[in-house]
Amino acid sequence: MLGTKFILNIFKNKFNNLSTRFIKYVIKSYKRTCPHISDFEPFSSMYYYTGLHNYRTFYLLIKINEIFNINKYKQIYIIVNTDKYDFTTDDIETNKKNRIYLDQRVDIKIRQCDEVIRINLFTTKLTKKVHIGEIKIDINASIISKCFPKNEWFVCIKDGQEVCKVQLSFYKTQKYACPSECMFIHDGLEIWKDKSKSGSTKKIDINNIHKNFDDNDEHLAMIDIDTDINDISLIQKLKLISFVLEQEICVFDFYAYVLKYMYAKEIMGEWFLCFLCFKNNKDQEEINIETIIERNIHRDINIPMLNIQRIVVDKRNNTNANIIYTYQDEKYTLSIHSKKNLYYIIDAITIFTNDLKILKESFGDELEYRKNIIMKENTMKKLMGKRRLSSPRFRKNLPKSTHKMIKEMYDEQDCSHDVKESNTQFFENDMKTNEIKNDNIQTDEIKNDNIQTDEIKNDHIQTDEIKNDNIQTDEIKNDNIQTDEIKNDHIQTDEIKNDNIQTDEIKNDNIQTDEIKNDHIQTDEINNDHIQTDEIKNDHIQTDEIKNDHIQTDEIKNDINTSNEIFFKAQLENTIQNI
């Protein structure tokens, strides 16, 4: 009798287990096949506004960061369940370690009627699936009311006992958006808000070029979890993802991995991925070419973002990766190492480069225009920031009388210093002009032969023509347009060519004809050609003299213009400093 009762109890327990499993399977299949009434309008709005449901349908990205106290198993996998949907992760190799760093992401749809998310951990033994434990997460209490928490620990329980702990992060995504991009934007927003509270953020000027170039901090502060990703400008996306890339990472330099500070920064309108030796170096606004090409432990490394081709993960070690980029048609590689966030960093760099390429392909001209504006602003800041009084914090502590004394002292020093500089520059320019004149006289003497100088002295008509040229140069001096000075030289040569009066004077000049007859080359040219253009071409003396006169006049004009510009700049700097 005892044996039969024992056997009957075994069958009864098996039947109860099978029946309960069957009932659960039927209910689960019914929920998955048959939709809930709240999935359709207007019932979904009725359920929401009457208070039966606490939230609308949305998409949730669950990021599994870390598992603690899972050293009993070699390999596990995770299944995330809701009432209708489930998602299975890849196999995770634990190798019997106490702490595992992961980057498993699960994108799942949360309906209005869903109340709980179940996260189940499984392992395999030969062909058998073994359940490790389960995590139950209340959607309203643990996720929505806490504004989608990040890096929060949850306890995995089986049969009322704690098995392990899992660190999770939750992100609200959109239907037609990339989940990873939404994740980086939300992380960047949290980092930016923390920085704005501490006051360490750097304000970027607004350039009203296009809506995708909006980088105003006030508009950035209006972005939240529910903001449509299409309403965020591309510059704002780049700015937020750059905050995500700001972290410490190991970089391989020659023979070892060295800890450096990674930072994505816009310098003079171009984005660079910087690996800095010291965190304080991120305020620099110049990039040295040697830091792009050379790999040195004691030097910063700067990589242009648009030159990054791909990032390859090492097959032997999942914590190492190689960044392959080009510069001046040559390939370079940089090895990075991270135990916790390697895949997170790789995805952030790839999404950043893709958004930057889209911005350049779609708005190339506007991007160049913005770059020019930033370069002009930086040059103006350098000019305006050379001479400042004291910091605003120091000014508040000073009394008014001392503040006035300091200001007057700096103003007097600036005025005297600027006047001295302007005077010295003006006298230096005068000395240079005199030296240039003397050099021109010497070159003219070397070029002109002794016979040609005698002909110039005896030729009164040519001197009259040179005087007329001087009158023309005086007219050019009164002309304010500098670009027309070069054109007037050609006009003057054309006037000399077309001047019939000069040809008649040369024909009627008996002295010059006697001198030209003695010269066989000049008599043949005058007899065969009555046009003065051929005379000017063949007569090297006249053309050289006229050209030298024009060169001298142009040099004198340029010296006058430079002296005027220097004096004007000195006045402008004085007015700026006084303001």
UniProtKB/Swiss-Prot annotation:
Residues 442-561 are annotated as: 12 X 10 AA tandem repeat of Q-T-E-I-[K/N]-N-D-[H/N/I][I/N]. Its main location: membrane. It is found in: Cytoplasmic vesicle, Secretory vesicle, Rhoptry membrane; Cell membrane; Host cell membrane. GO terms for cellular component: cytoplasmic vesicle; host cell plasma membrane; plasma membrane; rhoptry membrane. InterPro entries: Rhoptry_Surface_Assoc (IPR053336). Sequence repeats lie at residues 442-451, 452-461, 462-471, 472-481, 482-491, 492-501, 502-511, 522-531, 532-541, 542-551, 552-561. Residues 52-84 form the C2 domain. Keywords: Cell membrane, Cytoplasmic vesicle, Host cell membrane, Host membrane, Membrane, Repeat. The keyword RNA-binding does not apply. It is a peripheral membrane protein. Antibodies against CERLI2 severely reduces parasitemia, suggesting that CERLI2 is a potential vaccine candidate. Disruption phenotype: Impairs merozoite invasion of host erythrocytes at, or prior to, the formation of the tight junction. Merozoite development and egress following schizont rupture are not affected. Inhibits rhoptry bulb RAP1 processing but not secretion of rhoptry neck proteins RH4 and RON4. Causes defects in rhoptry morphology which are narrower and more elongated. No defect in microneme secretion. The keyword Cell membrane applies. Plays an important role in rhoptry physiology and thus is essential for merozoite invasion of host erythrocytes. PANTHER family: AG-1 BLOOD STAGE MEMBRANE PROTEIN HOMOLOGUE, RHOPTRY SURFACE PROTEIN CERLI2. This is Rhoptry surface protein CERLI2. It comes from Plasmodium falciparum (isolate 3D7). The lineage of its organism: Eukaryota, Sar, Alveolata, Apicomplexa, Aconoidasida.
